[in-house]
């Protein structure tokens, strides 16, 4: 049932909910009189005796809460004088019967109602304001003098969160034709003005008659969570800047220039094609059709400007097509694995790359006893140098060579860190290099230093040489060298200058053994490292 907003709507949560028993008879009489007047007004509205704008208005469906509103909010519905609205005589009688409690009832006072039930409150209508300081376009002409003015300090009762009005050229952009965007789903708009009179009539191009058949009653459940609805609307509302950025990206066009030089040109110097294209597909199609030609072409030469091949032909057309991608930048083979994003110019490169995702290693080392496997044949070829002792990767700054390019790159860092290229740095040692580590060099490698040593130091050096000779004998299997070195060591430890000299000789022999032993050790270490 659609109730009228006048005598049926009391001040929400104020005195109308707490009735007093000694006024029940007067309230019942007022309710009966008010119901009779309302039925007469509704019947007259159906017969066309009252203004259509006053009879047909939108409505808000309200679910009043159990708590009471503050006096400041309840004062939004101020008192009105008798005779301002149909049925006001009954309202005046009810106010007189209530006596001292009449202050608790607002201008829309009426009979009490059950707070647990829903009621309807008529929303403000649309229409031109009455001339001569009438209502501000809220109701029809017949209801222009219903409300008194309200102060600007009062807040909205239905939507307390609405910001205050702004006037002048800097008014809020959310206010359009007296309507404010409430931030609710469905683009609901509400009036930003309060219930008050204005000095001048509102210039509204839409009259009440025009809007009568366009806007029906609007029901809105006020028990919903307003804050959650506004947050939901804000979350799904995209900022307009994202759209403009997207459109700007679509408007940016690439300029791909064809640099193919026609060899049949008579001019000198010859000029390139210089045709521009907006997409890579257009450029590739142009080069394939206009310059490369079909299967009738027997000479597959790249005539792209500044091509490093310098006119050297290809054996097949597909090889020329693959080569042209170096100039055009075309990479038509993307990696299908999600999140990778890599693209390739050749299908075989994509095939090799996909093995990094699948873990496939189909290329096994061909050397007997080695079970190393690789994802591509080039890595296996580099690995084979470990077994064949080939060291094709030479250092350009020194005479060292390596079996793998990664070892050469590590070695080049030594030259970058030390400009003099010191070869005694431990960082220069690698499993692939052929030089002797400095820690295993025999003291006899520097014969000039042994003559300046004391007898005790010479004996210690001879002992170290004997130990090195023993290591050499283990790797070489030569027992005679070990015994000779041991004899030299014993002679060196016997004392005297001659003993020192004998120790030096033994040290020398041990040095040669150490060198040979290290060769075998280095070879074994290379196999283990790789």
From Swiss-Prot:
The modification Phosphoserine is found at residues 192, 200. PROSITE patterns: ZINC_FINGER_C2H2_1 (PS00028), ZINC_FINGER_C2H2_2 (PS50157). One of its GO terms (cellular component) is cytoplasm. Residues 478-519 have a biased composition (Gly residues). Residues 406-452, 476-530 are annotated as: Disordered. Its main location: nucleus. Residues 521-530 have a biased composition (Polar residues). Phosphorylated. The keyword Translocase does not apply. This is Zinc finger protein ZIC 2. It comes from Mus musculus (Mouse).
């Amino acid at each position: 049932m659609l109730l009228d907003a006048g005598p049926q709507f009391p001040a929400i949560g104020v005195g109308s909910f707490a009735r007093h028993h000694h006024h029940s008879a007067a309230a019942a009489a007022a309710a009966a009189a008010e119901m009779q007047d309302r039925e007469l007004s509704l019947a007259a509205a159906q017969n066309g005796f009252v203004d259509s704008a006053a009879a047909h208005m939108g409505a808000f469906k309200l679910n009043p809460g159990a708590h009471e509103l503050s006096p400041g909010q309840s004062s939004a519905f101020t008192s009105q004088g008798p005779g301002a609205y149909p049925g006001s005589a009954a309202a005046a009688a009810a106010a007189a019967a209530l006596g001292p409690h009449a202050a608790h009832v607002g201008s829309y006072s009426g009979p009490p109602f059950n707070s647990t039930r829903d009621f309807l409150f008529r929303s403000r209508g649309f229409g031109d304001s009455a001339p001569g300081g009438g209502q501000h376009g809220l109701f029809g002409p017949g209801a222009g003098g219903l409300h008194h003015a309200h102060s600007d300090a009062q807040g909205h009762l239905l939507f307390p969160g609405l910001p205050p009005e702004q006037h002048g050229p800097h008014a809020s952009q959310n206010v359009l034709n007296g309507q404010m965007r409430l931030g609710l789903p469905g683009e609901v708009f509400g009036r930003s003005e309060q219930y008050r009179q204005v000095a001048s009539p509102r210039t509204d191009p839409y009259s009440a008659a025009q809007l009568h058949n366009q806007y029906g009653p609007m029901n809105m459940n006020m028990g919903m969570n307003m804050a959650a609805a506004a947050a939901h609307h804000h979350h799904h509302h995209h900022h307009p800047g994202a759209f403009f950025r997207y459109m700007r990206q679509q408007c940016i066009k690439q300029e791909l220039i064809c640099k193919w030089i026609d060899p049949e040109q008579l001019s000198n110097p010859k000029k390139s094609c210089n045709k521009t294209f907006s997409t890579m597909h257009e450029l590739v199609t142009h080069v394939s059709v206009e310059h490369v030609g079909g299967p009738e072409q027997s000479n597959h030469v790249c005539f792209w400007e500044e091509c490093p091949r310098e006119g050297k032909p290809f054996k097949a057309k597909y090889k020329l097509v693959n080569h042209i991608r170096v100039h055009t930048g075309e990479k038509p083979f993307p990696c299908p694995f999600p999140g990778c994003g890599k693209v390739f110019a050749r299908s075989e490169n994509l095939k090799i790359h996909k093995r990094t995702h699948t873990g496939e290693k189909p290329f096994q080392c061909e050397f007997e006893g080695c079970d190393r496997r690789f994802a591509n044949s080039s890595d296996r070829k580099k690995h084979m140098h470990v077994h064949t002792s080939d060291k094709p990767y030479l250092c350009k700054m020194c005479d060292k060579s390596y079996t793998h390019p990664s070892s050469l790159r590590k070695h080049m860092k030594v030259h970058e860190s030390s400009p003099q290229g010191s070869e005694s740095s431990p960082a220069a040692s690698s499993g692939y290099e052929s030089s002797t580590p400095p820690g295993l060099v025999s003291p006899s490698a520097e014969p000039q230093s042994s003559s300046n040593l004391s007898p005790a130091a010479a004996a210690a050096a001879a002992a170290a040489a004997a130990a090195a000779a023993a290591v050499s004998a283990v790797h070489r299997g030569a027992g005679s060298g070990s015994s000779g070195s041991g004899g030299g060591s014993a002679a060196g430890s016997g004392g005297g200058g001659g003993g020192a000299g004998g120790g030096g000789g033994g040290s020398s022999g041990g040095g040669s053994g150490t060198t040979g032993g290290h060769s075998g050790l280095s070879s074994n270490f290379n196999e283990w490292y790789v």
